Amino acid sequence: MISFLRGPVAHIGLSAAVIDVGGVGMLVQATPKTLGTLRLGQESTLTTAMIVREDSMTLYGFADPDEREVFEILLTVSGIGPRLGLAVLAVLEPETIRVATSTGDGKTFTKVPGIGPKVAGRIVLELAGKLVPHGTVNGAPASPSAQWKPQVVAAMTSLGWSEKDALASVEKATADSPELISDGNVAEILRTTLRWLGQDGARTSAGRQVTARG
């Protein structure tokens, strides 16, 4: 894997730059912010990630290793490809992404063109626990446990539920789990609520069938 590139900047475009590495022009896709730090003819260093496909090999450039790490973790989300992952970094800072995933704030990701509520909710759900804000201790969520309910409700509304239904579902799903409430783990409470909704939906459907038969 090509971990970084260093050399004079030969070209700067709207979405990519060319770095002259030993006489070879390396085309690197990058965010407008990263491209804005480059100057034609000046030597620059870009942290890179190479994405290999059947018909292509593409280099993506980043300001630092932290930005690359967030990019690579974003690509583990189903439906998020390199272009959309780069679009997320074009709009949101790496730390903002870390905080949003750790607190279940799906609305933050809807600021990115091409990401709607469903995709935003999927990002939050699939990246729960994978991106930890740098300001936390021992991987604890950045927000106090006392504030978990608004965060879970926000994540559910980003998945399509109304705020009223989300709040009611959270309360019912956690009613018999005091330890879950005291821990205030947003990701775990969200998973528990979604599981409860699935079971409740099955029970409701079965009840309707019995009523219809009667």
From Swiss-Prot:
The keyword Hydrolase does not apply. One of its GO terms (molecular function) is four-way junction DNA binding. GO terms for biological process: DNA recombination; DNA repair. Homotetramer. Forms an RuvA(8)-RuvB(12)-Holliday junction (HJ) complex. HJ DNA is sandwiched between 2 RuvA tetramers; dsDNA enters through RuvA and exits via RuvB. An RuvB hexamer assembles on each DNA strand where it exits the tetramer. Each RuvB hexamer is contacted by two RuvA subunits (via domain III) on 2 adjacent RuvB subunits; this complex drives branch migration. In the full resolvosome a probable DNA-RuvA(4)-RuvB(12)-RuvC(2) complex forms which resolves the HJ. Residues 64-139 are annotated as: Domain II. This is Holliday junction branch migration complex subunit RuvA. Residues 144-214 are annotated as: Domain III. It comes from Renibacterium salmoninarum (strain ATCC 33209 / DSM 20767 / JCM 11484 / NBRC 15589 / NCIMB 2235). It comes from the Bacteria. Belongs to the RuvA family. InterPro entries: DNA_helicase_Holl-junc_RuvA_I (IPR013849), Hlx-hairpin-Hlx_DNA-bd_motif (IPR003583), NA-bd_OB-fold (IPR012340), RuvA (IPR000085), RuvA_2-like (IPR010994), RuvA_C (IPR011114), RuvA_C_sf (IPR036267). Residues 1-63 are annotated as: Domain I.
